[in-house]
Amino acid sequence: MKLKFTHKTWYFFLLCAAAASMLNGFAVLGGMDFSFLEMAAFCITGITLLFLAAEKGSSAKDKRNYFGLFVVLMLSYMGRGWAAYICSALVWPGLLGYEYQKGRPIQRQLQLVGAAEVLHLLFVLLTVYGGMVGLSFWANLLWVLLACARGWAALSLYKMQEDA
């Protein structure tokens, strides 16, 4: 039996990453620390981007763009301060923007994820660097909503792929 990995496989992994992120967000809202789920979501997203970049038969432009998104994701992990938050907020909109550019009808998902990333980034930066600790609940709530938006986008991409 030979395993065949297609875009549909990797979009499923993106859906799993969004689900892990959502579970972590619900745990944080409940006062628990499930940060390992966020690390799992980060790893799944990174692996997915790498495998999308390495897919046999894809164009050089695809490889370059997916690998570039992987580099931005790594910068979000290795970076410090506000730059890391900004790099983190660029990955999913960048991925969805590229998929939209390739002709996938995901304009609404792209708009929702982009808006959710901007709002979440704003609230996180105000909480961490602006000293507005009272906004931390709203930043965490926006994290859950952002994970839901990412999940919807990943599910849409998954459903658009033909069964292979």
Task: Mark where each language-model region is.
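Juxtamembrane "helix-exit" motif on the non-cytosolic side of transmembrane helices
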Residues: 22-31, 75-79, 123-134
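Internal transmembrane alpha-helix with an interfacial aromatic "cap," most often the third helix
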Residues: 37-65, 92-103
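Cytosolic juxtamembrane helix at the C-terminal end of the final transmembrane segment
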Residues: 3-5, 52-57, 94-109, 148-164
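N-terminal topogenic module of multi-pass integral membrane proteins
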Residues: 1-51
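Hydrophobic alpha-helical membrane segments
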Residues: 16, 87-98, 107-131, 139-146, ...
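Alpha-helical transmembrane segments of polytopic membrane proteins
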Residues: 34-46, 82-92, 136-147
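Membrane-proximal helix-loop-helix units in multi-pass membrane proteins
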Residues: 62-111
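Membrane-interfacial loop-to-transmembrane alpha-helix junctions, especially the N-terminal start
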Residues: 5-14, 56-67, 105-113
